[in-house]
Amino acid sequence: MGNCLHQAELSPSTENSSQLNLEDLWDFPYNGNDSFPEINYDASLEAAAPCYSCNLLDDSSLPFFILASVLGILASSTVLFMLFRPLFRWQLCPGWPVLAQLAVGSALFSIVVPILAPGLGNTRSSALCSLGYCVWYGSAFAQALLLGCHASLGPKLGAGQVPGLTLGLTVGLWGAAALLTVPITLASGASDGLCTPIYSTELKALQATHTVACFAIFVLLPLGLFGAKGVKKALGMGPGPWMTILWIWFIFWWPHGVVLGLDFLVRSKLLLLPTCLAQQVLDLLLNLAEALTIVHCVATPLLLALFCHQATRTLLPSLPLPERWSSPVDTLGSKS
């Protein structure tokens, strides 16, 4: 953020020096052998100096952005190929159309990572940056909502128990994700060649809406799933949300939602940081949380592959041999 949002306070030595200037020195007799009291100017300058934070994701981090983007695109493309490959066992995964959409969301995120990366010169326009943030957060919101539905509905997604559910989920969840990206799309642009959110009084409402959306989707949603799982298990009301390895996805976005909320409170002066060090720690956490979100585009396809491998390894031995090969085709027909 650049500067600490607290007022600089003078040290006791500085306050004493000011009193000497105003009171004692007025009537202080001067002769050639006497000297004026020493004033600690260094303490005053240090207290009034602005607080600067070093950006962890500066121009030197461009290779990290590019590497994550390339690996994410390759991994997501591989998972999509396996999911749509005819007569392949991954099509037996419960809710594989939802899993395919997760891979699509990860691929979209990977594609826009270089657009928002620093160190690519000053050629990016505000429109391109706004589009980049729209896809960046839109794909993340869609993945989080898809994971929530996959956990809530569980095997129903793959058993054909709810006709037309896949199409309804696709339209509804991606539409909701697109609406949630409107605030950050309008409150972002290019500054000195870098894509960045725009913080101003006029756009404060948009930034607040975006912060609330991130906190609700990335923080409250996984906490709600865990809470529902625990409550239902404790009360004996059923298994609750379907807990799988895919829930690890939220680890990559949960810190971002928390730190983004803290940063907004500080910018709005609803939360005052006592020291410059606290401000620098918050800025560092913002950069680390952003780096963790970038890593998710590589981790998500790996989680999908591991989930499909575990699901098919458990499911295939329980199916008769002819049904093992007919099930993917039947699944495709029932979902179309």
Curated annotation (Swiss-Prot):
It is found in: Early endosome; Recycling endosome; Membrane. Keywords: Disulfide bond, Endosome, G-protein coupled receptor, Glycoprotein, Membrane, Receptor, Transducer, Transmembrane, Transmembrane helix. The chain crosses the membrane at residues 64-84, 96-116, 130-153, 167-187, 208-228, 245-265, 288-308. One of its GO terms (biological process) is inflammatory response. Glycans are attached at N16, N33. It comes from the Eukaryota. This is Atypical chemokine receptor 1. It comes from Sapajus apella (Brown-capped capuchin). The gene is ACKR1.
